[in-house]
Amino acid sequence: LWLWKIAAWSMGLAVMAYGILAGTGIGMSYFRAQKSPRPKWLRPLHYTIGIILVSLVLLLLTIGIVGTLGHFGNLGHSPHLIAGITVVGLVLLSAVSATQISPKRPWARPLHVTTNAVLFFALAYVSWTGWTVVQKYLN
């Protein structure tokens, strides 16, 4: 049960981190569009929260695999596995594309923004499938 508590807290924090990242990302976009200097703390905060999100989804992946193998002995009991792997992939793609954003790589920013838009729906789906998995464990 303690493992699922860690997972629940981690998922809540991951969703919160995503919200903060959306806010800081929109803020950076606003300052760029206005051609005005952004606050010096904004980009480091965005990167730091991004690193936290990557860490949280990797922790969630580990908990999911260990917990499912420990409880069932194998994986693939629900769509939650595919949803979780999709979220991990999107978060990693977002993180890698973020490191590539520069005037020399005009493809990186649209990839980063689009990935994060898709991630919104993936997080909603993985949250829903996760809720159904938790109900299985509680029954």
Question: Which stretches of residues belong to each language-model region?
Answer:
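Membrane-embedded alpha-helical bundles that constitute the cytochrome b-like, heme-associated redox core
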Residues: L1-N139
